[in-house]
Structure formats: C-alpha cells, structure tokens
Amino acid sequence: MNKKLIMVLSVSIIIVFIGYIIFDTVKPAGSVKNETKNAAIVEIPDAWKVSAEFKVNEGYLKAVAVNAAGTIYLGGDSFVSCYNKDLKLIWNVKTPSPVTSLSNFGDTVFASTMEQILVMSPAGKILNQLGPFEDSCIITSVSSNKKYVAFADAGNKMVFILDKGGEVKKMIGQNDRHFVIPSPYFEVALDNENNVFVANTGLHRIETYSIDGVLKSQFGEAGTAPGSFCGCCAPPHFALIPEGFVTAEKGINRIKILNKKGEFVEFVNSKNNFIKSVPLNLASADGKTIYGAYPADSKLYIFNRNTTP
C-alpha cells in the first residue's frame, strides 16, 4: 500500500514538473517580465571622447577639481598642484599627508587628507587645517559652496557639514547609521542651494539631503544597464554638472551622464582599457569638459563631446 502511494506521488510530481516546463516554454514573449536589469543591454556608443591625457609627475594622482575659469587643481600622494587651462603648472605644494579629494569655491581650495581638511589660498599657501574630527576617520570626499564645507567620512559612515570656520553644524548618518559603505568610496557634493548630494555606495544610489540632514530624494539601483550602477559600491565618484550628474563606476569602468532625476542621458566613456576596479575621480565646471584623475597611471584624462558622426 505504501509503495503504491509513493508511486502515485512520484508520478504526480513528475507530471507537475513537466507541465511547468511546457508552460514556461510556450508562454508568449510578451508575458515575460524584465527579471533583471542586466538582460539584453543595447549597445550604446560613447557620446564623448578623450581629447587629452596629461601625466602627473608630482606624485601618485588621486583627485581633481576645476573652477569656472578653467584652473585645474590636482592632488595625491602627497601634493596639491595648480595648472592653468592649458595644463601649464602654476604652483605645487607638498602636503603633510596624501590628499584624498579636492574642492574649490571662489578663491579658496579645500584639500582633504584622511583626517583633516586643508584650507588653501589661490597661491597654494595652507591657511588652515580643519580637524581631526572623529576617531577612525577616513575622509574620502570634500565639497564646498559659499557658506558650507561638507566632507564624507567612510570610517564612521557619516557626512559632516561645517561652516567656513570649521565648526561642525550637522552630522548626517550619526543616529540612524543610514549609509552603507563597504569600501573607502564615499562621495559628497554641495550645490549653491545648499542641497547635499551623497553617494550611498552600498545601496547603489545617490541621495539628496537638506543642509539640516533631511532626506529629500534618492535614485539609483544595482546593475549593468546604462542607467544602473555596477560594482559592489557605486557610484564611487560623481560630480555635479548643469544637466545633472556625471558618475564613475567600477566593475565595469565607465563614466556616464544622468539628468537631475537620475535618468540615463549618455555615456561619456564606456569602452576603454581602464582597470575595472580603479574608477576615475571626476570634476567639471560647466558640463562641457569633464576631467578624470586616474590613480592607476597618475594621468589626468580630459573628455569632450564627440562631434564626429
């Protein structure tokens, strides 16, 4: 009796399994949902090209910033250099520690090390050193506007908002531990309206906060589709441009432009020989020229729109 029952159950399971296979095979294509953001990616040509490459000899290159006049600031291990728009050296300053990121507003340059923010004059003189701020601090990004300086601390998974005198006005992520930061890629950017843009890299999105730390909006998802962010922690770097954002990725080392809603616009550079795991640090003053500092070869890559068909 038990053998008959087992046989009946076995036959029933086989019939159900075969039926599922038949249904899955014959169901119309229109009923198949896009189950992955990585499926059937359409080939999209790059809309930009590398117009120049510039080898940096001052040291290991990690960061770039640029102002509206085209003045370029480069930083790394352990230096900050200033170049004019024709890549002629204006000044070079040795720093007490390796520089992890750069920002400038008006006539002031801000250079972050792992524990401090260096405040520099247009001539390269170090005017002030802000910090240290917290134990286990790993500053990965600094940004400034008319009133505030913001920096991202990957060690403590927080964003600090300072006034120009260096006083801490707000710490975002302090209580809710909201930021998921698997590796030392953690970017922040301030705009002129005091919006704070933060790359929550472990969640593959860019989040917008008020200066008081209130979450206003967010966008982004993991994947290899043009509008998604690839890699374990993405976007590792981004810069604000008038159109929206220019973002870097790793895993697939590509640079792209997203509009202010986070929607894909175009690829700046997706077909290259860059090391997959080493993203470019990005800067742009006008959205017409994009600068990428590449640590793997200590070169500055300059991108302009491709005018050829």
Predicted segments with their positions:
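Eukaryotic scaffold repeat domains enriched in small/polar residues
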Residues: 2-309
